[in-house]
From Swiss-Prot:
Binds 4 Mg(2+) or Mn(2+) ions per subunit. This is Carbamoyl phosphate synthase large chain. Residues 930-1058 form the MGS-like domain. Composed of two chains; the small (or glutamine) chain promotes the hydrolysis of glutamine to ammonia, which is used by the large (or ammonia) chain to synthesize carbamoyl phosphate. Tetramer of heterodimers (alpha,beta)4. Pfam families: CPSase_L_D2 (PF02786), CPSase_L_D3 (PF02787), MGS (PF02142). It comes from Streptococcus pneumoniae (strain JJA). Disulfide bonds: none annotated. One of its GO terms (cellular component) is cytoplasm.
Length: 1058
């Protein structure tokens, strides 16, 4: 069927900010879909609140609205734009839920907007647990016995009839939020109570646990003519019971017989046909390893994290084709863009193995609950491709960037057998490493399979890796063993460790004996047809398929897996850099390991290498491609850390040079540079041990800010107010970087702001100054940022511009740099300089209309700012006000404290723009789902040093009609200043403490600040946790509360007698 001509204008809903469970894969899907629809000649209108994505660039759709994805704003845009149709299946759970809400409120009918791709009934059937159960029974597809409950008591009664363990799954939540496995009634009560609160329809499904079955996923496509096919099947290394987003996954599935594959394939295809889904769909199944019994676990009637993985694993662009199917095209009419010759009706065939390993945020959250279950906790993932399981698994391990270069963590050798086996049985994020250690200790694959229900096939592969380790140890310098090790994915560094030599010597030995990798193409058809995609992976074998072209090339290093502190913003910069390289007439080559992002879409660059970002893997590509140079400043800390080893190996680093990167990163050199340039910074010292730190702090005076040098995202950074806390910090955090000392700085409580600058070595362009709403001490990535600045005087802005120019020229910056300042009493201090693109690049690029990463790349390749038409200095500011606000994923991470400080905790961001500060703030709060009603109660629990300031806020809340509650000390302070607050009890005062008021819905907002003694704050932590679990807005910085007050004041009426 040809494409539809009765619709012209289509609206696409994006997925909003990045949170755990909904990450960059939707930026990739949405970008592909919008371009795919434009290619067919439709007018595309996009709504998405996330400025950090490629998807919200002007070129992606005909009209891009960066507005909150809420009923209020989406309805406004629908009324204004009047599209013919709406495509909701590319915006993750956010997009689906929005479509449901628009439909239930009658907006779609009123405006005559048709839903494309997936019918509402199908969304309902797949998402509503009851309807899903009915449909499966009709299709005679087996599902675990289950019951829908709306109260805790119903749950307990049902569990009594089927027996424990049971699984709780709340309806309409994302990434398993609020669900979990329960081994007894106590756990069931706890999890169900929480799950009912988090489900928008207060219902949960209680089902028999089938933990221990194999978890298999099928990614399927269907069109309007009922053609359906399987794009890819995938098998989880971890059995059922661990969320698939937190599992190690292999594609294609490895341990199923042909019969089992056909059985599950038929089930998946019959389900997508019954749901009449037009587009992509993901079916998760559980297979009993000991019989041919299986269960259907769930169906996602949309593009998902698994479909991004399947697209990258097979090269088959699911989202692009889903968009074409949505407008009526069929699979036998669309050409597969990978081969350029076969139709999309061909099922992909793979002649390689793909491994995906999740990346978790626990390096940032040491207190976080690391046990894995049905609720997702990973922030991102890596993927690696190899010719065997060992190779793809080991390549994926070294892509993770958690300080490992093999499937082993050396410290585990010291763990006792009992502790080891406990970690093998009770899965945490690092279980793979514990299982590998158990094998090294001589536990047999059979024993481990019995304990973990991991298939023995995979455990044999781990045993094979260990056998090769032993061979290497027994035969140093042996070329045959070296070849075997390389064929199985071993890194030079691991081989060097076992041989007692250096990585460099192993590399030399390889090169002398021509043991080098070849690069194979990902072509969807197992090399059956010629393919035109330049998408490659390395392996040790015959025939290299990546042919170097005659054109001069430039290699751009990506930023690896998404984690806190290094998010999709860096991928954005990478993609823009590639566009500029191509525009300058070079061949652009990308190297990256993240399957979720736009940069690893094969149509973005001239060549894509899907490889770990390590020195060895990057050098192999450089040896083959011989590029003009490498650009490292867009890949975050990942790429910057590779600059020095690459330069030592004689590689040309384009842009700011290594010596100058060092001057910005190394503390002593940086201080010296600032002295020479006559720029003030807060007084500080370096310390290598506890005593030196204590001395430094006494000399500078408390409070001090302590942190290791060379880190991203404020890892292990703290504000310390007394010597006792300082000593405990030195004992726990110095491990963060043994070679690099700890920095001790005077902590200046002032107004913080930051600047991104672009320099060609002569002139410096400053697109804008962003002012932080939270005062210094909250990490810049967790602060709300406002552009243009609202409170900085002209003199301060001129000083900032002047210091920025001096620094850019003085540090020989070529390309991008980011500088953070703190201002106190009109005096400007420099806090830090990052000689690379920062996480504010996408936001600033969008609000100033300067494509910053592209401009920077053009400068790196030799053009000047004046040639590109930009002036020296601060760019004229916009008339509208734009706010970048952080979004957190605390609901997903038990035991992580939500108190904001110098260590970054947010996973994503949203943007609010309008004519005034108050309106822009309102949009930013709405977009980040911090909704405050216009009346209700606010509770204050404030540290002594902030009580004065809080009193003023409390008065203003009272003036607009809010009720004020406060904890004992705070209430007494308010009363002595003539403000009556209703006191609330201490934690543990049943029914009178804050958590119980929160549970009863009597509190609309909590304002909680923490004083100098961090140790005595367990109460505060419980209060903050209760706010997060019940979705009550929580402010741990008075400045954010003040911003929210401005919004409420601008929206409220004051009643006064005359």
């Amino acid at each position: 069927m040809p494409k539809r001509t009765d619709i012209q204008k289509i609206m696409v809903i994006g997925s909003g900010p990045i949170i755990i469970g909904q990450a960059a894969e939707f930026d990739y899907a949405g970008t592909q879909a919008c371009l795919s629809l434009k290619e067919e000649g439709y007018e595309v209108v996009l709504v998405n609140s996330n400025p950090a994505t490629i998807m919200t660039d002007k070129e992606i759709a005909d009209k891009v609205y960066i507005e909150p994805i809420t009923l209020e704003f989406v309805t406004r845009i629908l009324r204004k734009e009047r599209p013919d149709a709406l495509l909701p299946t590319l915006g993750g759970q956010t997009g689906l839920n929005m479509a449901m809400e628009l439909s239930k409120n009658g907006i779609l009918d009123e405006l005559g907007v048709e839903l494309l791709g997936t019918k509402l009934s199908a969304i309902d059937q797949a998402e509503d647990r009851d309807l899903f159960k009915q449909l499966m029974e009709e299709l005679e597809q087996p599902i675990p016995e289950s019951e829908i409950v709306n109260t805790v008591e119903e749950a307990v009664a049902f569990a009594a009839t089927i027996g424990y363990p049971v699984i709780v799954r709340p309806a309409f939540t994302l990434g398993g939020t609020g669900g979990g496995m329960c081994a007894n009634e106590k756990e069931l009560r706890e999890i169900t109570e929480n799950g009912l609160k988090l489900s928008p329809v207060t219902q949960c499904l209680i089902e028999r646990s089938i933990a221990g079955f194999k978890e298999i996923e099928y990614e399927v496509m269907r069109d309007s003519a009922d053609n359906a096919l399987v794009v890819c099947n995938m098998e989880n290394f971890d059995p059922v019971g661990i969320h698939t987003g937190d599992s190690i996954v292999f594609a294609p599935a490895q341990t199923m017989s042909d019969y089992e594959n056909q059985m599950l394939r038929d089930a998946s295809l019959s389900i997508i046909r019954a749901l009449k889904i037009e587009g992509g769909c993901n079916v998760q199944l559980a297979l009993d390893p000991n019989s041919f019994k299986y269960y259907v676990i769930e169906v996602n009637p949309r593009v998902s994290r698994s479909s991004a993985l399947a697209s990258k694993a097979t090269g088959y662009p699911i989202a692009k084709l889903a968009a074409k199917i949505a407008v009526g095209l069929t699979l036998d009419e669309v050409i597969n863009p990978v081969t350029g010759s076969t139709y999309a009706m061909f099922e992909p065939a793979l002649d390689y193995v793909v491994a995906k390993i999740p990346r978790f945020p626990f390096d940032k959250f040491e207190k976080g609950e690391r046990r894995l279950g049905t609720q997702m906790k990973a922030t991102g993932e890596v993927m690696a491709i190899g010719r065997n399981i060992e190779e793809s698994l080991l390549k994926a391990c070294r892509s993770l960037e958690i300080g490992v270069h093999h499937n082993e963590i050396p410290e585990l050798a010291a763990v006792s057998d009992d502790a080891l086996i406990e970690k093998v049985v009770k899965a945490q994020d690092d279980r793979l490493f514990y299982v590998s250690e158990a094998i090294r200790r001589g536990y047999t694959p059979e024993e481990i399979a019995e304990l973990t229900k991991i298939d023995i096939f995979y455990l044999d592969k781990l045993l094979h890796i260990f056998e090769i380790e032993q061979e290497l140890g027994a035969h140093p310098q042996d070329l045959e063993v070296l070849k075997t090790a390389k064929l199985n994915g071993f890194s030079d560094r691991k081989i060097a460790e076992l041989w007692g030599t250096t990585d460099d010597q192993v590399r030399q030995l390889r090169l002398e004996n021509k043991i080098v990798p070849v690069y194979k193409m990902v072509d969807t058809c197992a090399a059956e047809f010629d393919s035109e995609t330049p998408y490659f992976y390395s392996t040790y074998g015959w025939e290299n398929e990546s042919i170097r072209s005659d054109k001069e090339s430039v290699l751009v290093l990506g930023s690896g897996p998404i984690r806190i502190g290094q998010g999709v913003e860096f991928d954005y910069a990478t993609v823009h850099s590639v566009k500029a390289i191509q525009a300058a007439g070079y061949e652009a080559i990308i190297m990256n390991s993240n399957p979720e992002t736009v940069s690893t879409d094969f149509s973005v660059s001239d060549k894509l290498y899907f490889e770990p970002l390590t020195f060895e893997d990057v050098m192999n590509v450089i040896d083959l491609e011989q590029p003009k140079g490498v650009i490292v400043q867009f890949g975050g800390q990942t790429a910057i850390n590779l600059a020095e080893p690459l330069a030592k190996a004689g590689v040309t680093i384009l842009g700011t040079q290594v010596a100058d990167l060092d001057r910005a990163e190394d503390r002593d050199l940086f201080e010296q540079a600032l002295k020479e340039l006559d720029i003030p910074q807060p007084p500080g010292q370096t310390a290598t041990n506890e005593e030196e730190a204590a001395l430094a702090a006494r000399k500078i005076g408390f409070p001090v800010l302590v942190r290791p040098s060379y880190v991203l995202g404020g890892r292990a950074m703290e504000i310390v107010e007394n010597e006792e806390d300082l000593r405990s910090y030195m004992r726990t955090a110095v491990k963060a970087s043994p070679d690099h000392p700890v920095l001790v700085d005077s902590y200046i409580v002032g107004q913080e702001c930051e600047v991104d600058a672009i320099s060609d070595g002569k002139d410096v362009l400053i697109p804008g100054i962003m002012e932080h709403i939270e005062r210094a001490g909250v990490h810049s990535g967790d602060s709300m940022a406002v552009y243009p600045p609202q409170t900085l005087s002209q003199k301060v802005q001129e000083t900032i511009a002047d210091y920025t120019k001096r620094l850019a020229i003085g540090l020989h910056c070529l390309g991008m740099m980011n500088i953070q300042f703190v201002i106190k009493d009109e005096k400007v201090y420099v806090i830090e300089v990052n000689p690379r693109a920062s996480r504010t690049v996408p936001f600033l690029s969008k609000v100033t209309n300067i494509p910053m990463a592209q401009v920077a790349t053009k400068l790196i390749l030799g053009q000047s700012l004046s040639e590109l038409g930009y002036q020296n200095g601060l760019y004229p500011e916009s008339t509208r006000v734009h706010i970048k606000a952080p979004v957190f994923s605390f609901t997903k991470l038990a035991k992580v404290d939500s108190l904001l400080g110098p260590e970054m905790k947010s996973t994503g961001e949203v943007m609010g723009s309008d004519a005034t500060l108050e309106k822009a703030l309102y949009k930013a709060f709405e977009a980040s789902y911090l909704h405050l009603p216009t009346f209700g109660n606010v509770v204050f629990t404030i540290a002594d040093d902030a009580k004065e300031e809080a009193l003023n806020l409390a008065r203003r809340f009272q003036n607009i009609g809010y009720g004020i509650l406060a904890t004992e000390g705070t209430a007494a302070f308010f009363a002595s200043h003539g403000l009556q607050a209703q006191p609330v009890g201490k934690i543990g005062d049943d029914d009178k403490d804050i958590p119980s008021f929160v549970r009863k819905g009597r509190i609309q907002a909590i304002i909680n600040t923490v004083g100098t003694k961090r140790t005595a704050d367990e109460d505060g932590e419980q209060i903050r946790r209760s706010a997060i679990e019940h979705g009550v807005p929580l402010f741990t910085a008075l400045d954010t509360a003040n911003a929210m007050l401005k919004v409420l004041e601008s929206r409220s009426f004051v009643t006064e007698a005359i």
